[in-house]
From Swiss-Prot:
One Pfam family this sequence matches: tRNA-synt_2
Subcellular location as annotated: Cytoplasm
Biological source species: Herpetosiphon aurantiacus (strain ATCC 23779 / DSM 785 / 114-95)
Protein's name in the database: Asparagine--tRNA ligase
Keyword Transferase: no
Enzyme Commission identifier(s): 6.1.1.22
GO biological process terms on file: asparaginyl-tRNA aminoacylation
Enzymatic reactions: tRNA(Asn) + L-asparagine + ATP = L-asparaginyl-tRNA(Asn) + AMP + diphosphate + H(+)
Key words, A-Z: Aminoacyl-tRNA synthetase, ATP-binding, Cytoplasm, Ligase, Nucleotide-binding, Protein biosynthesis
Length: 447
């Protein structure tokens, strides 16, 4: 016997009037006398299945009444047009085959707290909003790779276990590596991807990255996914232009492919429809000045309307500062040329201003903060070695990385985009933990 259904719900529109066999899970069920209404989901869509007692055998009607939330089943019937349905059709049921009858499903239609839902994350992902979020995530990942592939970037996988730090030593997860000492979970794939840049010219890696930050904010996870392009003969302006086109492509893909998901999430898509190049750009110096002007004017920051805190030149921005600066524009905002002391060792100094580096953060609108960090990389071996020493790192650990500057070095640039932050912004969800199937946080590693 074939186990596959005759079609998936999403493909049913062209088969109205035909007899079909659908397979899935009971999302919701209501009974009204001689009628049973079953909301059946199969992962592609949800359809209403109507069981008329007069149209089925007593056994089939009994099975319909027996079904419980999240029971799995096959449902046979005829597709019928119905303007009231979000799909435009529903299923008149003729037969039901129960695969598994669920008992006491823990996530009932009543309201549940976040703690409870996170402890049942393996089941919560079945709910409509979580399903929509994760479909958007899948489209973001697909679009990101599709765009880079179309621009002649080659996927170049980087290791998860590394011998050295890439962004600093304070937030590394360490593990023993046989007799060779400690290995670390990768903070980024960038350093390794730079080796591929000299091989293919344009490369990217995609995978999980790890930060042992003791942070409990809605923007932070200890494990998150990054896509990190790197390309040769490219400066900071080339880098920002690539990011503009890259992000705009992803946004359009989500608008085109996730219309129903965005509706489920009640996302105001008008705020996404104008995300097209060029994006506004301001320097770090200009950003500090705008913050000082905001403080002087008594500016407050959403969502709590807390007073905007002052900053001095050389300070890094906190989440409220990013939110305030982004609120001054209606598109993602580039802030470029940050102070050297707040950025990583591998960033190229600005010409004539060694106190700043040629980098840029891309800040999403609506308070979602930084979604991309990028820079032009140092391509001079002596300068790079000096920067490694300044950051208190062991030069011996980076000889392989310095080799990339000793043999055919060229100006090059790259960036990293956090998938979860991008998904949270596009979906309009306030907490990053819902933008990944199984979030890892300071106080959560289960399930």
């Amino acid at each position: 016997m074939a186990l596959l259904p005759s079609m998936y719900i999403r493909d049913s529109a062209d088969h109205v009037g035909e007899a079909v066999k659908l397979a899935g899970w009971v999302y919701h069920k209501t009974e009204k006398g001689k009628l049973v209404f079953i909301q059946l989901r199969d992962g592609t869509a949800t359809i209403q299945c109507v069981v008329f007692k007069k149209n089925v055998s007593e056994e089939v009607f009994a099975r319909a009444k027996e079904l419980t939330q999240e029971s799995s089943c096959y449902i046979h019937g005829t597709l019928r047009a119905d303007e009231r349905s979000s799909l435009g059709f529903e299923l008149d049921v003729t037969d039901i085959e129960i695969v598994h009858l669920t008992q006491n499903y823990p996530i009932t239609p009543k309201e549940h707290g976040t703690q409870f839902l996170m402890e049942h994350r393996h089941l919560w992902v079945r709910s409509a909003k979580q399903h929509a979020l994760l479909r958007i995530r899948a489209q973001v990942i697909a679009a990101a790779q599709e765009y880079l592939n179309s621009e002649h970037f080659v996927r170049y996988d980087s290791p998860i276990l590394t011998a050295t730090a890439a962004e600093g030593t304070s937030d590394l997860f360490a593990t023993e590596y046989f007799d060779l000492g400690n290995a670390y979970l990768a903070q980024t794939g960038q350093l390794y991807v730079e080796s591929g840049m000299a091989t293919f010219g344009r490369v990217y890696c995609f995978g999980p990255t790890f930060r042992a930050e003791k942070s409990k904010t809605r923007r932070h996870l200890t494990e998150f996914w990054m896509i990190e392009p790197e390309f040769a003969f490219a400066d900071q302006d080339d880098n920002m232009e690539l990011q503009e086109n890259f992000v705009s492509y992803i946004v359009q893909r989500v608008l085109d492919r996730c219309e129903e998901d965005l509706k489920i999430l009640e996302r105001d898509t008008s705020k996404l429809e104008n995300i097209v190049p060029p994006f506004p750009r301001i320097s770090y110096d200009e950003a500090i000045e705008k913050i000082k002007q905001g403080v002087a004017a008594g500016a407050t920051v959403a969502p709590d309307n807390a007073p905007l805190a002052d900053l001095e030149w050389g300070d890094d921005f906190g989440a409220p500062h990013e939110t305030y600066l982004a609120s001054l524009f209606d598109k993602p905002l580039f802030i470029y040329n940050y102070p050297t002391k707040v950025k990583a060792f591998y960033m190229q100094p600005a010409e004539g201003r060694p106190e700043v580096v040629r980098c840029a953060d891309l800040i999403a609108p609506e308070g979602y903060g930084e979604i991309i960090g990028g820079s032009q990389r140092i391509h001079d071996a002596e300068l790079l070695e000096a920067r490694i020493r300044e950051h208190g790192l062991d030069v011996a650990d980076y000889q392989w990385y310095l080799d990339l500057r000793r043999y055919g070095s060229v100006p090059h640039s790259g960036f990293g985009m956090g998938i979860e932050r991008c998904v949270a912004w596009l979906a309009g969800t306030r907490h990053i933990r819902e933008a990944i199937p199984f979030p890892r946080q300071l106080y959560r590693i289960y399930p």
